[in-house]
Amino acid sequence: MQKVKAAIIGSGNIGTDLMYKLRKSEVIDLNAMIGIDVESDGLKRAKEAGYEVFDNGIQAIIDNPSLADIVFDATSAKAHRYHAKTLEELEKIVIDLTPAAYGPFVCPAIRNNNFLDKQNVNMITCGGQATIPIVHAINGVANVTYAEIVATISSLSAGPGTRANIDEFTITTKRGIEEVGGADKGKAIIILNPAEPPILMRDTIYCEVKDMDEVSIYEAIHKMVERVRTYVPGYSLKQEPMFDGNRVTVFLEVEGAGDYFPPYAGNLDIMTAAALKVGEEFATQIISEKKRGVMNEAK
């Protein structure tokens, strides 16, 4: 089957987990892993897996533009702001897994979130990918006036990039809650839990609504959970939604697939699984366009 070439920039936890997911794709051919530390575990694993590896960062794409049509950026918000302009000049489709928010926000569980005509899209944050679908579901039936989310992740699953981006995480997730989730006002908090053994990713979503309808909200939440589970099987409700006046609280748990980090790192898994799904939609579109072009030439 025809595949579209891709590269990953960023050989940390997220980039390495994404590498293992891309290996299974039927429409994306991972061609290279790019980092800046030759001793990083991600570059070592990529080399062992047979991928071309580079330790000179974005320069690898500049020097070898044919490496990839789709570039996944798993570096940092600061680095992506520089990468974005370069990759735009090189006409690469960019899927940004940092909180840079350079391109429009994308959450694959939200079907009216059109993005295939964009060159650069942003995957918001791990907390955003877990919670924004629920905010969106509630808003669709009850009009969310305020939404607050608390994402709790194992400290062991948070690499240096995640730790350096805490401020960007809260700002970008807040924006995503409002712009994609539909809440009039949003707030986001992240907690790194050092507990041993490491805990699974847990998310709490608190919404105040204008039009309380417990039955409709309950059904909307369950439908959205099932939709997210189509690409993140470990995504689940920790308990049934709680209702109190005009307020609804939802408790989620995300267990990772264990592709790179152990299953407690659901925060990595939901981010990379969402990025894979978005990348495959872009790849499918590219393949379809190439087929149409060949057919038109044949005519």
Swiss-Prot record:
The keyword Nuclease does not apply. The active site is at residue 126. One of its GO terms (molecular function) is NAD binding. Keywords: Aromatic hydrocarbons catabolism, NAD, Oxidoreductase. Its EC number is 1.2.1.10. Transmembrane segments: none annotated. It catalyses: acetaldehyde + NAD(+) + CoA = acetyl-CoA + NADH + H(+). CDD domains: ALDH_C (cd23933). It comes from the Bacteria. It holds the Pfam family AcetDehyd-dimer. The keyword Ion transport does not apply. InterPro entries: Acetaldehyde_dehydrogenase, Acetylaldehyde_DH_C, NAD(P)-bd_dom_sf, Semialdehyde_DH_NAD-bd. NAD(+) binds at residues 11-14, 157-165, 267. GO terms for biological process: catabolic process. Belongs to the acetaldehyde dehydrogenase family. This is Acetaldehyde dehydrogenase. It comes from Bacillus thuringiensis (strain Al Hakam).
